[in-house]
UniProtKB/Swiss-Prot annotation:
Its main location: cytoplasm. InterPro entries: Naa35/Mak10. It comes from the Eukaryota. The lineage of its organism: Eukaryota, Metazoa, Chordata, Craniata, Vertebrata. This is N-alpha-acetyltransferase 35, NatC auxiliary subunit.
């Protein structure tokens, strides 16, 4: 290690090595290696020397600069070969534009698929798809199969880009939409490209049939190989055509197009095994002489677009492997099949649940965008047929049965009441469309946006309460036996609470909370949010029953026949049951964490620049914009959760027993649910072992150990299995 003591000359000769520089230069260099190593010996293992001039900013800069990914922009200077574009490569004879062999076609197609997927995963077109020279200008290609495939890939990219841009549920880390001035085959129609692909497909199918083995005939190995290779090209070309046709179907406004896409996805899935089994037939990439692992093979040049990249450090594009490509397409097909199912839903609440469940799989940006554009066609109508206002009214009817939406009620035909409810419903459209759009974003961005949308729902809550009061006053004059109190307000409050719960729970999924914070997060959920949610659901259920009774009495008055009463399943009963289970899980975790803290098993940081209060207030800051339910401030929380108010205050064994009862209660509730879904089974996988662990801890197991427990979130994203170490 050397250090420059003074600068006497300029930095000419910067390409020389350090010893050569030292010899040539007039500068006085001092070797500090020995001194540096001796100074390092004084530091203990893991200890760092803090210098005033070397703070966190400089440390991060050093880490970033030394990361090999930061050398991506420098690769061009370290290549031993000449980088050629498509036209230069044709003149140079390094690329074939006609008479491509079957292995060449297979290899190029597979690598193109890999580049396409890498682009969909957030890298730029310049570093992925457009490293394939054939894609730059398909007009130069004379080979019909290669030309049709290149145009097909361009069209897939163009429609995918249009869909993702239209849905607007991507961030810079999800998707790069820049085309860098490349033509996206706009001069050729979609129909023409699918026709060209079909022609190649038919031609390949004829070759597949002509090389097929016949009964009793001895098989020529060369003919068999040709048969396998023709089948491989046929499968890839057909897959490209089907994928393109699916994306075209999603651009149509008719709902029938979704059914068409569903059928095509089945065809695409059937082709994947043939593609997977023939991966070895394609030409393989040669060893790259550059740093990085971009494939170098005929038709590909990873550095061809290096000059198009922005002056900032380019992202390091690691092209996925061919084996992974098939698995990715299989998952993409499954996701698109799921997207197609949304058109079968009619209730807004079911649609919201569908979006939540779909988002939990962390789907790719393309499938998220397709779901958004299928739901709201041109941002006007749901599935292109239903008005969002009608969906909101149906959701209100099914959830809380407000008298104003009942045809048998006086308010239904009252102009003033009609104006009130119509105005409220119109104001609901934007927040609910925004909420559905939020579920299209990636999981990390969703949480941030949920925090912001609470403000809109708080305003809606205020309006709902005012409309309820106005409608109630009108109703009392005509039908004193009926009430219109807290109908619309209950419905908006329900959605408010769901957003708040989702906001807090997603923090566990994203690993945002430290272990010492768990106890107040679970407390807020169990004692506050789930308690409010259950009372809101019970109130909605009560409103439904009251409305049903009035309807039955009106029916009785008209009909003298006695009708047999069937036991009706309450629409909200399952949700109330699930909320009870969630509340018990949260309460069990809260008491577990408090007991661990008492036993000294929770490591707490030495707060220097902040405190627990600062952290608490930061975690619940978005809730300050909500008036109902009112936010619980830190001092209020400390007072409400203070165990000293009990006489005598419970000790850790009693808390472990209480926690075990909560886990047992959750287990019993869930085991009684008919037709349990995946979510029920996932929670049971946590409730059962936690019940056993709490029993062990209550009996004094590992009482003296101060080793913190492990929290395993693999079974469920929000509730960990507690493991004693």
């Amino acid at each position: 290690m050397v250090m420059k003591a003074s600068v006497d000359d300029d930095d000419s000769g910067w390409e020389l090595s350090m010893p050569e520089k030292m010899e040539k230069s007039n500068t006085n260099w001092v070797d500090i290696t020995q001194d540096f190593e001796e100074a390092c010996r004084e530091l203990k293992l893991g200890e760092l020397l803090h210098d005033k001039l070397f703070g966190l900013f400089e440390a991060m800069s050093a880490i970033e600069m030394m990361d090999p990914k930061m050398d991506a922009g420098m690769i061009g200077n370290q290549v031993n070969r000449k980088v050629l574009n498509f036209e230069q490569a044709i003149k140079d004879g390094t690329i074939k534009i006609k008479d491509l062999t079957l292995p060449e076609l297979i290899g190029i197609m597979d690598t193109c698929f890999c580049c396409l997927i890498t682009w969909l995963e957030g890298h730029s077109l310049a570093q992925t798809v457009f490293t394939c020279l054939y894609i730059h200008n398909p007009d130069f290609i004379e080979d019909p199969a290669m030309k049709a495939f290149a145009l097909g890939i361009l069209k897939i990219c163009d429609i995918a880009r249009e869909k993702v841009n239209k849905a607007a549920v991507f961030e810079e880390e999800d998707f790069q939409s820049m085309t860098y001035g490349f033509k996206m085959a706009n001069s050729v129609t979609d129909l023409r490209v699918t026709g060209m692909l079909k022609d190649v497909e038919d031609d390949m199918q004829r070759r597949v049939k002509s090389t097929r083995s016949r009964q009793g005939e001895e098989r020529d190995p060369e003919v068999e190989l040709e048969h396998q290779q023709c089948l491989a090209v046929f499968s890839r070309v057909k897959f490209t055509r089907v994928l393109l046709t699916v994306l075209i179907a999603f651009t149509k406004k008719e709902t029938s197009a979704v059914a068409e896409a569903q059928k095509l996805m089945v065809q695409a899935a059937d082709l994947l095994s043939a593609i997977h089994n023939s991966l070895h037939h394609g030409i393989q990439a040669q060893n790259d002489t550059t740093k990085g692992d971009h494939p170098i093979m005929m038709g590909f040049e990873p550095l061809v677009n290096q000059r198009l990249l922005p002056p900032t450090f380019p992202r390091y594009a690691k092209i996925i492997k061919r084996e992974e490509m098939v698995n990715y397409f299989a998952r993409l097909i499954d996701r698109i099949k799921t997207v197609c199912e949304v058109v079968n839903l009619t209730n807004l609440h079911c649609i919201l649940d569908f979006f939540c469940e779909f988002s939990e799989q962390s789907p790719c940006v393309l499938s998220r965008s397709l779901l958004q554009t299928t739901f709201l066609v041109d941002n006007k109508k749901v599935f292109g047929t239903h008005l969002m206002q009608d969906m909101v009214k149906d959701a209100l009817r099914s959830f809380v049965s407000p008298p104003v939406l009942s045809p048998k009620c006086y308010l239904y035909n009252n102009h003033q009441a009609k104006d009130c409810i119509d105005s409220f419903v119109t104001h609901c459209v934007r927040p609910f469309c925004s909420l559905i759009q939020i579920h299209g974003h990636n999981r990390a961005r969703q949480r941030d946006k949920l925090g912001h949308i609470l403000e809109e729902f708080a305003t809606l809550q205020d309006e709902a309460e005012k409309v309820d009061a106005a409608l109630h006053t009108m109703l009392l004059k005509q039908e004193p036996q009926r009430q219109h109190l807290a109908c619309l307000g209950t419905w908006v409050l329900y959605h408010n609470l769901r957003i708040m719960i989702q906001y807090l729970l997603s923090g566990f999924e994203l690993e945002l909370y430290s272990m010492h914070e768990y106890y107040y997060i679970y407390w807020y959920l169990s004692e506050f949010l789930y308690a409010w949610l259950m009372s809101t659901l019970s109130r909605a259920d009560g409103s439904q029953m009251a409305e049903e009774r009035i309807m039955e009495e009106q029916q009785k008055g008209r009909s003298s026949k006695k009708t047999k009463k069937k036991k009706k399943v309450r629409p909200l009963s399952r949700e109330i049951t699930m909320s009870q289970a969630y509340q018990n899980m949260c309460a069990g975790m809260f008491k577990t964490m408090v007991a661990f803290d008492m036993d000294g098993k929770v490591r707490k940081p030495k707060f220097e620049l902040d405190s627990e209060q600062v952290r608490y207030e930061h975690r619940f800051a978005p809730f300050n914009s909500v008036m109902t339910p009112p936010p619980v401030h830190y001092l209020q929380f400390k007072e409400m959760s203070d165990l000293n108010k009990y006489s005598p205050p419970p000790q850790s064994p009693e808390l472990y027993v209480a926690a075990s009862k909560h886990f047992q209660q959750a287990k019993m509730i869930l085991e009684n649910i008919p037709n349990p879904d995946h979510e029920v089974n996932r929670i049971l996988k946590v409730a059962k072992p936690n019940f056993v662990v709490m029993k062990l801890l209550a009996g004094g197991h590992k009482k003296e150990s101060k080793v913190p427990p492990e929290f395993d979130f693999s079974a469920h994203k929000y509730f960990p299995v507690v493991k004693l170490v």
